[in-house]
Structure formats: C-alpha cells, structure tokens
Amino acid sequence: MSFGTRISRALRFLEIPVKNRASVNFLRNPDLQPIKSVNQTWGFWSNFAYWGVLSFNVGMWIGGSSALTVGLSYSETIGAFIIADLLTILFALANSCPGYDWKVGFTLAQRFVFGIYGSALGIIIRILMSIVYYGSNAWLGGLCVNMILDSWSHHYLHLPNTLSSKVAMTTKELIGFIIFHILTAFCYFMKPYHMNYILIWSCVGTFFAMLGMVIYLTKSAHGVGDLFTSTHSTVTGSKKAWAWVYTISYWYGSVSPGCTNQSDFSRFGSSNCAIWTGTIVALLIPATLIPVFGIIGASACEKLYGQTFWMPMDIFDNWLTTNYSAGARAATFFCGFCFVMSQISYTISNCGFASGMDLAGLLPKYVDIKRGAIFAACVSWACLPWNFYNSSSTFLTVMSSFGVVMTPIITVMICDNFLIRKRQYSVTNAFVLKGEYYFTKGVNWRAIVAWVCGMAPGLPGIAWEVNNDYFHNTGIINFFYGDSFFSFLISFFVYWGLCLLFPFKITVKHDDKDYYGAFTDEEARKKGMVPYSEISEEEIRAYTLGECFTSGHEYKPESSDDELPELTKTSSENTKVFEIVHQKDNEKESSTSSEKQIA
C-alpha cells in the first residue's frame, strides 16, 4: 500500500460520521445548516438564562475586584458597569439578527461578510478566545468542585500540596480542575439547543446561593461593612473621566466574545421578542446585581474576618477551616453544587459549544460540534489558567484586551447587515465556493481593511497595560481606555466608506425556497420564500443531504470581484461545489438579476 493511499484512508477515517458522505465537504456539514423550525424552542427564560449564566457565576462575583484597580469608588464602578451593560445589550441585539433572521450560526455569518476564505480570520480569533475563556472558567469550576469535596471530607480540606512551589496551583486545585473537565465533557453529547434547561436551573440555583451568602454575611456583620461605604475614588479630573471610560471598555470587553457569535444562539430563539426581552433583562439586572453582591460580600468579610475575601470559595474555606460543623458543611455543599452547575453552564454555552461550532466551520469535513468542543477543552490546559488569578491586574488585562480584537469584527458585521445587505442573505450561497460571497478570491478585502483599521490603534495600549514602562504616550493610553467606542466608529465608517467607493454587486438577496425547513410556512412566505412543505422531497434531499454536490457544475456568480472561469465539470466528489439552484432557476435569475450596486 502506497503512502498516499494510507494518508487518504487515514483522512477518510477522520471524517465526521454521517449517513451521506456527500453532505460533507470543505464548506459544509450538517452542523452548519440552518436550525429546523421544530428546534427553535428558546423562549424568554432560555434566552435570559443564556446571558444569565454570564452573571450567575463566580467570575462575575469577583469582577468588581478587577475593575476597582483603576481608582474608582464602588458606586462609580457600579455606574460604569451599568453603562457597559447597556453598550453590550446594543451590540448583542444588533449582532443577533443573522441568527434570528436566517437561523444560521457565526460561521455562515462570517462568510456573508468576510467571504468564503476570509471568514477564517474571525473564526480562528473566536476559537482562540473561546479556548482562553474555557481555561479560565474551568479553573474556577475546579475550585467550586473542591467546595463539594471539602464538605465531604475533613482530610481533603487539609490535603497537603505535593506539587512544586514553582507551579501556581496546589494538588487540590489540580484534582478539582480535572474533575470539572470530566463533568463538562459529558455535556457535549447533547445538542446545543437542548442545553437551555441546564442554563435555566443553574441560574436559579446560583442566584439563591449568592443571595443567601450576602444575607448571612451582612446579618453577621450587622451591615455591609465600612469598606463598601468608605472607599473613595483615587483619581480626579481627566484621569477620572478616562478611568470611567476604561472601566466601561473593560466590562464590555469581558463579554464581547459572546456578542460576536450571538447568532450561534439567537438562531434557537422561538421569537424575536423572546430574544430581545431575555437578553435585555439578563444583561441589565444580573450583570449589575452580582458584582454588587461580590463587593458587599468582600466588605462584610473585612469587618467579620479582617480580610476582603473576593473569591466565594475563600469564604467557604474560611468557614470550614475555623468551624467544620454540620451547618458549615451543608452550606458549602449546596452552594458548591450550584456554583459547579453555573460554571458548567457558562463553560459549555460560551466556550465549549461556541468553539465547537467555530471549529466545525473551519474544518467541517473532519470536525463537528462535539469534536470541536472536546478539542477546545483539551487545549485550554495550555493557557495555564491558574496564572490568570495570581493578581487581579493580570486578569484585567487578559479580559479587557479581548474587546480590542473582537469589537471591529462585531462592527463590520453590524454595518454589513443593516446598511449594506439590508438584513438579506442567501444561505445556500454560503455553501458555494465561487458564489455570492466569493468577493475577491474568496475574501472581502473591505471587511479585512476595516477590521485592521479598528484594531491596530489599540494594540500598543495592550502592550502598555502589560508593562507600563514600554512608553508613556497619553494619547495611545487613552485610546486604549476608550477602545470599545473608538474602534467601533473607525471600523464602521471605514467599511461603509469602502463599500461606497468600491461597491460589490448584490445578485442574490435571499434564497427563493426554504430548503432547510428553518421557517414555518407563514414565516417563509413573509420572507418571499417557498415554504418547506411545498418543496419536493427530491429537491430537499439535494440541498440538505448534499446530493446536489454531485451535480457536476460550478455556480458562476455575477457578484464576484474576480473574473471567474466558465462552468466546468469537477472530478472529485468531495471537492464538488453544489449548484445554487436548478438550471431553469439559474436561467431565470440571470435574466432578471439586478445590477444594483451598493450605495
């Protein structure tokens, strides 16, 4: 057997298991197709819980500690958080439209805007962000697992550390980290749209656990403590104004990856109202309330124990260490269980499934959502997440810098959706190499330029934040502080301007038929599409199972910036690009296709 044959067999073995191999190629697999209408079941509480787990977790509880390093008082920090939450709501809702309008995820939304090949840029960046967040959340989840184990065994509570002092973690922390990864991995055997019940119940349990902690601490301390009321701002004048701007950018930057791939989960929504109300309530109330809980808890702990415990796990560890009673053990177990559930929910929704969807879009022939999520879990170890929490300033840098890279991507997507395409996209064209979204050799260079222009000015600020001795240019530093605002404006107007100066033709506004069963009959007709129920089984099979890949023709669009070759036969089944519509539809479209350019 030749070496080439062995490689070919190995690659074929690695392909994702599907009933019809023709349904998988380098542009598509079943996980990338629009969600069927029967699976669009996320109502208000499901959408609330998706964003709610962002707040009802340990990371949000300790969020106030990181933000306070910029010099604002507690009340000013909370005010900045509220403004940042409003900004996040606007970005999240605006970027949810492709998912709700066309029931597609982040991968196809990237192809719509950045091009078939250019979409890899945003997908790779989002994967890297997900992996970093995965490691961070898994580390906190491991600490929560240890809460449960501590309540079970006094010996485990005092388990000696056998690791080297050079490693920034203990044996207990490593055990909890491993157990949390194992628990989380089981969740990836279910479909993403079935995880909403886990999200809902984890939010409910964690809210009452945190509320109980605050009530107990404030009652024991006979108030919220002096730290909460006596802390004042340490900056004045313009420095104070920029501290406000920075805190807003930091708080937004910590959740911007979730805004970027909002379409991954808005496509599960049962109605636009459910998505909007669930998102607004979750990002406005819990996202403001839980950091306040954390600040009150730290203030009360300082009065009670002489220390400002920011980590909830440290509070329970102190209780068990000083009094290993039945009451302390019960409280630790139930709160630990709720915290573990919240960390699992947040990790699988915002990191695991998200990275799985992204990896499926990057290598659809070999990766599905389950494989991608498990891969991200394994690679997250390389981030050394235990180092994130050595100091709040280090973690603040990691969190806030994400917005520098992600905000321009979000901005370009919003501009393209509302001003350029007018919320009209063709899903079937996203599975065609040289189709509507081929642009220039597969890349929409306008979007790339806008992204670079919005991102580049903020990069020196990240370097300065890591080491303040690099330079002392006030303008660069202040730009970094307000990057979430400035990069949005730059990317938005650069992309809009480039589309006006160098317009591309829009020849296919949307699909003429609902090939994937993503809409009810009424919804399909409102969009000007033939309902799924009125399409022949042969045509549905051709589009959903990929049999149209074997049609042997390559679709030649009029929208490409390049001069494409004539229609040709292709030899390999796995590299064949399926025909957008039947030949008669192509003839009809070519005769009536609009030559309208973007203006």
From Swiss-Prot:
It is a multi-pass membrane protein. One of its GO terms (molecular function) is nucleobase transmembrane transporter activity. InterPro entries: NCS1, Pur-cyt_permease, Uracil/uridine/allantoin_perm. It is found in: Membrane. Residues 553-599 are annotated as: Disordered. One of its GO terms (biological process) is nucleobase transport. The modification Phosphoserine is found at S560, S572. Residues 579-590 have a biased composition (Basic and acidic residues). GO terms for cellular component: cell periphery; fungal-type vacuole; plasma membrane. Keywords: Membrane, Phosphoprotein, Transmembrane, Transmembrane helix, Transport. The chain crosses the membrane at residues 42-62, 78-98, 112-132, 174-194, 197-217, 280-300, 333-353, 372-392, 395-415, 447-467, 484-504. Pfam families: Transp_cyt_pur. Induction: Induced by limited extracellular thiamine levels. Its main location: membrane. Low affinity thiamine transporter responsible for intake of thiamine. It is possible that the primary function is the uptake of closely related compounds and that thiamine transport is a secondary activity of these proteins. Belongs to the purine-cytosine permease (2.A.39) family. NCBIfam families: ncs1 (TIGR00800). This is Thiamine transporter THI72. It comes from Saccharomyces cerevisiae (strain ATCC 204508 / S288c) (Baker's yeast). The gene is THI72.
